[in-house]
A protein has these predicted regions:
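Surface-exposed loop/turn positions
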Residues: 28, 41, 78, 86, ...
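Ligand-binding loop in jelly-roll beta-barrel domains
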Residues: 84-109
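Short, conserved beta-strand element in jelly-roll/cupin
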Residues: 49-65
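Short strand-coil-strand connectors
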Residues: 26, 66-70, 93
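A short glycine-rich, His/Asp/Glu-containing loop-to-beta-strand
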Residues: 11-47
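Short acidic-glycine-tyrosine-enriched beta hairpin
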Residues: 69-84
Length: 114
């Protein structure tokens, strides 16, 4: 029988990850996280590769996604995909708020470490 449990997560009470993200709802195959009011930084952060796929949506602010040699400007209303294993980094240009979903869940098994 399928699990029909409904889980509600209030972001004000969500745990924070090591990089400042708030962990939201999480299932067996996908998890959500919130990047809230991330401040503009002095430049591109170091590139990383993750063993999960990420899709995101910009709520407010601006950022630049550097993805496998491409430059993608992100603004409110934009969404993006970072494939599993792709080299990428983000540069916050203007105080930035976005929500992301990761599959498999980024917070499991230490996948979401800086």
């Amino acid at each position: 029988m399928a699990d029909t449990t409904v889980t509600k997560v209030n972001s004000r009470h969500s745990p924070r990850g090591a990089m400042g993200q708030r962990y939201l709802a999480s299932g067996k195959s996908v998890a959500m996280r919130l990047w809230e009011a991330e401040e503009a930084d002095s430049g591109e952060k170091s590139a990383s590769r993750r063993d999960y796929e990420t899709v995101g949506y910009v709520i407010e602010g601006r950022a630049v996604l550097h993805l496998e040699g491409q430059t993608v400007r992100l603004e409110p209303g934009d969404s993006w995909v970072v494939p599993k294993g792709a080299e990428h980094s983000y540069e916050i240009v203007e105080t930035f708020t976005a929500v992301e979903a990761t599959s498999p869940p980024a917070h499991a098994h230490g996948r979401d470490e800086p």
